[in-house]
Amino acid sequence: DIQMTQTTSSLSASLGDRVTISCRASQDISNYLNWYQQKPDGTVKLLIYYTSRLHSGVPSRFSGSGSGTDYSLTISNLEQEDIATYFCQQGNSLPRTFGGGTKLEIKR
């Protein structure tokens, strides 16, 4: 199985900040990388698929980049509603494995 690693498990930022969350695959996944958002109430939403393609209805402040084994999700102009845990998932091969998640919190 392909292992997905998110080295930062939690991240604090201020509203309006630009935040980048990284993800690394144990082998080349040919850009088959998705990003999911899990809100504190448990709601899960697909944000980005195939590295950089924005899912329908997702605000343009979200963007994705990367290639090979290294990928990132960037949130520009952080809003309160973006407070959530973010997971990467590889779709290159079965099983479609997930990273451990990065919890985004507001800096006090």
From Swiss-Prot:
Gene3D superfamilies: Immunoglobulins
CDD domains found in the cross-reference section: IgV_L_kappa (cd04980)
Disulfide topology: 23-88
Annotated region (Framework-2), positions in chain: 35-49
UniProt keywords, alphabetically: Adaptive immunity, Disulfide bond, Immunity, Immunoglobulin
Gene Ontology CC: immunoglobulin complex
Complementarity-determining-1: annotated span: 24-34
Region listing for Framework-1, in residue ranges: 1-23
Region: Complementarity-determining-3, residue numbers: 89-97
InterPro entries, per the entry: Ig-like_dom, Ig-like_dom_sf, Ig-like_fold, Ig_sub, Ig_V-set, IgV_Light_Chain
Residue span of region Complementarity-determining-2: 50-56
Region (Framework-4): 98-108
One Gene Ontology term from the biological process aspect of the record: immune response
Domain of life, per lineage: Eukaryota
Pfam families associated with the record: V-set
Positions of the UniProt region annotated as Framework-3: 57-88
Note: Anti-arsonate hybridoma protein.
PANTHER family membership: IMMUNOGLOBULIN LIGHT CHAIN
Name of the featured protein: Ig kappa chain V-V region HP R16.7
Source species: Mus musculus (Mouse)
